[in-house]
Amino acid sequence: MKMRSLLSLSIAGLLSAPVYATTVTGKVTDTAGQPIAGAEVKIEGSRRVAYTDANGIYRFDDVKQPHIHLHVYSSNYIHGDNDLGDVNTGQNVDFVLKPASVENIVVTANALQSSVLESVTPVTVIGAEKLHKIEAPTLGETLKNAPGVHSTYFGPVSSSPVIRGNDGPRVKIVQNGLDVSDVSRVGPDHNVATTLSSATQVEVLRGPATLQYGSGAIGGVVNVVDKRIPQYQLDGVEGEAETSYSTVNNGSYTRADVTGGSGNIVWHVDGFYRDTDNADIPGFASIDPDEDEPNGVLESSAMETRNVVAGLSYVAEEGYFGFAVEQLDNKYGVPGHSHAHGEEEHEGEDHDLEEHDHEEHAEEGVLLDVDMTRYQAAGEWHSPFEGITNLKFAAAYTDYEHAEIEDGEPGTVFTNESSDIRLSAYHEEVNGWHGVFGLQFNHSDYNAVGEEAFTPANTTSSYALYLI
């Protein structure tokens, strides 16, 4: 009877333990005392985020975390933070941010997610605003003017990034930190199967920072970041749309991006459609043109691309978990890409770019028909247990196929089925040091069938542990 009474008192004591809900507010200004509008304020170890208004004011209500560490980000200012420690009363915390000489963006490909100015390794980040201004049909053409980056130019619709003179498998392409899992590293005229229409930023890593993505990426890593899996709560609907037209190839481009939510459920949908004819050029494409080559047209440079992405997340203060699916259909030509066929001659043939109403003469060149389906999941759990501040999970499964079509028939077919899983744990501060450790698993089943199947079929599995 006595033990039962003690147990009842203990349970009652636990249930009646106070749960503090505090309010955190403050003002963000620059060194001249002027308010900074639109600055992003985050509570570390939480999915809570607030943005400053026109007067630089931010506010968090009903904060239940006992330990509060605030971070402030603004693209034109140096990152600010303030560790308040354990608090149980309302807090008023002001920030004064120093201006940055360059746009200051958080690098998500970096394990510790430091900003550009705080990063000790070479990194280039292109933000959403600039990205939409320079966006080209391919990743290689989009990044070709970034420092140390060039393009394996095979026409306006076929190229891949070259970093510090390295391409192919020496340059790794990832989408939201996971391998894009196409076959662009196999051939320089194979496009990267990642899209930029809804990307929030593109990050180019060089040097030791690339080791967290494997030992083979000695040239660099390109990380395309988008918001297909929502990570923060949103009440209502927001989005944007764009359409454009180019005269050089009668090209049309339309994209839309919509995100909405209610309570803990947040969804996202985006997509685009691009359709171009062969590009107009001055004169002939060849140095020594034959009599059948047309003047003023770059043959086999047309493109038709469709892409749709849909994602859904459950977002709470303790973390989030979401899932997304993507479907990419891309048909594009490779100018001047001809193959020997014994004594056969292919002259004066017309190639139809799959339901295009415009016929283009193409003595040389092939059409690449890409079909890719990608499933991706991601999640984050704040303060899961003692000693760990964050636990992150990301996984992707990709089913990729592309056929190189010549004379209306598939010549070589490349396929790749790939799975990529990454788990990261961030430990609490130890003597002023922050760190992360984790593991990654990748499985790839690659095959190529046809006259240009220059690499044998192979199945690869890799496991890795890392500590930073």
Each predicted region: which residue ranges?
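A short, solvent-exposed loop/turn motif at the edges and junctions
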Residues: 43-45, 71-83, 282
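Short, acidic Ser/Thr/Gly-rich low-complexity loop/linker segments typical of extracellular
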Residues: 47-57
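Short, acidic, small-residue-rich periplasmic hinge/interaction motif at the N-terminus
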Residues: 73-77, 87-132, 140, 168
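Short acidic/polar hinge/loop motifs at secondary-structure boundaries
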Residues: 179-206
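Periplasmic-side early beta-strands and strand-to-turn transitions of outer-membrane beta-barrels
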Residues: 239-242, 253, 257-368
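Flexible loop and strand-edge segments within Gram-negative outer membrane beta-barrel domains
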Residues: 301, 320-391, 397-418, 450-459
